[in-house]
Regions:
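Short, surface-exposed charged micro-motifs
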Residues: 60
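Exposed, interaction-prone extracellular/peripheral surfaces
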Residues: 1-39, 44-54, 63, 68, ...
Length: 265
């Protein structure tokens, strides 16, 4: 199997020219310029009227003569944009009936996005709730990704953009509590699923094992549960969207059966 780093490197090469936004809103994503704010930087930003107490050395004499009023120069501080990546690492992410687990696909997705941003040079990246920092090595990024803890233990650090990767198989009240801990406006919720979790292709007697340690469940006729199961799963997906969409977040769904290049479409 190709390593997740190799897959992420290949995918990140596609993300940059694709200019893919993290939100459905028309905000810059790949290659976005740093924000500007008034500061003590060396780059000229704008003129403004001179006021008492301003440094006389900053008076723009030529501009003041042209506009016939005293003007002073303002400079800018470049403020790097920040991206927080969170990948769920619960046991349910390891379930698979395909060549790739939800965990593997989520890791590749996060690494690709993070590395694409890190290569732009003006993005600070936070992995798994850690501090925002500059990354110069995707292997270091991968190591920090593996340190994941549930962000229910505390809010994620404030960020301009947030990418959440999970199967989101939580009770609705748990999802609501988790989402309340996110301090960002531009958020993408990436819901990964195994095709069997949607189609429920089982029939006859089946013993289901709870990957989270809740014990086994023996079902005598799995096929008889298919319709009710599919309805419950669809209801859960709608509940997730009902929590995310009113916040202005984007919800996308990816099957482990398909390539992650689907995110480019």
């Amino acid at each position: 199997m190709i390593s997740r780093v190799a897959e992420a490197l290949a995918l990140s090469d596609l993300l940059i020219p694709a200019f893919m936004p993290l939100s459905h809103q028309p905000r810059p994503w790949q290659g976005a310029a740093p924000r500007q704010r008034r500061g003590r930087g060396t780059e000229f930003w704008q003129f403004r009227p001179y006021t008492a107490g301003d440094d006389a050395a900053r008076i723009a004499w030529r501009a003041s003569a042209r506009y016939r009023q005293p003007l002073t120069k303002e400079h800018e501080d470049a403020v790097p944009s920040s991206l927080t990546l969170w990948v769920d690492r619960r046991p349910t992410m390891g379930f698979t009936t395909t060549a790739r687990t939800k965990q593997h696909q989520a890791d590749v997705m996060a690494l690709a996005w993070g590395w694409a941003m890190a290569r732009q040079g003006d993005w600070l990246i936070s992995l798994q709730g850690g501090p925002h920092q500059r990354y110069h090595d995707i292997l270091a990024m991968e190591q920090d990704l593996d340190k994941q803890v549930l962000f229910s233990q505390g809010p994620l650090p404030p960020a301009d953009k947030v990418l959440l990767c999970s199967d989101f198989l939580y009770p609705q009240e748990t999802l609501a509590a988790l989402f309340s801990l996110i301090r960002a406006d531009d958020v993408q919720v990436c819901m990964l699923y195994d095709p069997a979790e949607v189609s429920f292709p089982y029939q006859g007697p089946i013993r289901f094992r709870d990957l989270a340690g809740g014990g086994d469940c023996l079902v005598e006729d799995a096929q008889a549960l298919r319709t009710s199961y599919q309805a419950r799963y669809a209801e859960h997906t709608r509940a997730l969207e009902a929590l995310a969409l009113p916040r202005g977040w984007l919800v996308t769904r990816y099957s482990t059966e398909g390539p992650l290049t689907e995110m480019l479409g």
